[in-house]
Amino acid sequence: MLEKVKNIIVVLSGKGGVGKSTVSTQLSLALRKNGFKVGLLDIDLCGPSVPYLLGLEGRDIFQCDEGWVPVYTDESQTLAVMSIGFLLKNREDPVIWRGPKKTMMIRQFLTDVRWDELDYLIIDTPPGTSDEHITVMECLKEVGCHGAIIVTTPQEVALDDVRKEITFCKKTSINILGIVENMSGFVCPHCTSCTNIFSSNGGTSLANYAQVPHLGTLPIDPRVGVLAGSTTSVLDELPDSTTAEVLTHIVEKLKTIFVS
C-alpha cells in the first residue's frame, strides 16, 4: 500500500515527552502548506496523540476492498492521518498488548492502509528503540525508508538516549536527515523574548558529534501549544515565530534532498 508514496520519513526520539508528535504534526501541516500531499502515520500504539493534536478524536476508520481508509483533515484530501487512536472507544483506554500483537498491528498499518498518491509519509514513532521500530524498518525494506528526523531536548539525560537512537539508525541503515532540538528556551507570550530554562545547544553539539545536520532549535512557545486540537499550521497562525522559521527551514531542506 506504500507504492504510491514518494518519500517516507520516520520521526524518532530517544526519550518520551520531547515533543516528537508535535513536531510530526506541524511538519506535516507545513509540508501541506507548501503544496505537498502528505500522510501522517501514528504508530505510537500505547500513547497515540496525533488524533488529539489535530482535533480528529472521534473520527471513524472505514474499510474498503483495498484496506483501511485513513482520516482526511480536509475536503481536498491533502493530509491523510492514521492512528490506533481512531480505533479506541475512549481516549483514556490503555492498549495493553504484548510485543507480537503490537508487531501485527504495525504491519497492518504499513501494509493495509489505502494511501493515495503522497509526496510524503511522516511516521510518528514511540520513543526508544523497541519492537515497533524494528518492525517498521523490516516492513519498509522493500519500499525503503528515505530518512529519519530525530527530536531531542537540550538536557543531557535526553541527549544520552538520542545517542542510542543514532546508533540504532546506523545499525539499521537509516539515513539521518537531521536533529531537531525542541523545548530550548521559553518564549514569553507578552514580550516574545526567549529565556533559556534548561541547558542550550545540546542538539547542535549532538549533530556535530554524529556528523549529521542540525535542522533547527525550537523554543517552548505557549502560542504553539494553543494550536493543539486543530489543523492550523504554525506557518499560518504564527508566521513570524521561531517555530515557523525552523519548520520552513526543514521543509526547504527536504525539498533539496528529495525530488518530488
Swiss-Prot record:
Q: Which residues bind [4Fe-4S] cluster?
A: C188, C191
Gene Ontology biological-process annotations: iron-sulfur cluster assembly
Gene Ontology CC terms: cytosol
Q: Which UniProt keywords apply?
A: 4Fe-4S, ATP-binding, Cytoplasm, Iron, Iron-sulfur, Metal-binding, Nucleotide-binding
Name the Gene Ontology molecular function terms of this record.
Answer: 4 iron, 4 sulfur cluster binding; ATP binding; ATP-dependent FeS chaperone activity; metal ion binding
Entries under InterPro entries matching the protein: Mrp-like_CS, Mrp/NBP35_ATP-bd, NUBP2/Cfd1_eukaryotes, P-loop_NTPase, YlxH/NBP35
Chain residues that bind ATP: G14, K15, G16, G17, V18, G19, K20, S21
**Which cofactors?**
[4Fe-4S] cluster
Cystine pairings recorded for this chain:
none
Q: State how the cofactor is bound.
A: Binds 4 [4Fe-4S] clusters per heterotetramer. Contains two stable clusters in the N-termini of Nubp1 and two labile, bridging clusters between subunits of the Nubp1-Nubp2 heterotetramer.
Functional description taken from the UniProt entry: Component of the cytosolic iron-sulfur (Fe/S) protein assembly (CIA) machinery. Required for maturation of extramitochondrial Fe-S proteins. The Nubp1-Nubp2 heterotetramer forms a Fe-S scaffold complex, mediating the de novo assembly of an Fe-S cluster and its transfer to target apoproteins.
HAMAP family per the UniProt record, alphabetical: Mrp_NBP35, NUBP2
Quaternary structure note:
Heterotetramer of 2 Nubp1 and 2 Nubp2 chains.
Which protein, by its recorded name, is this?
Answer: Cytosolic Fe-S cluster assembly factor Nubp2 homolog 2
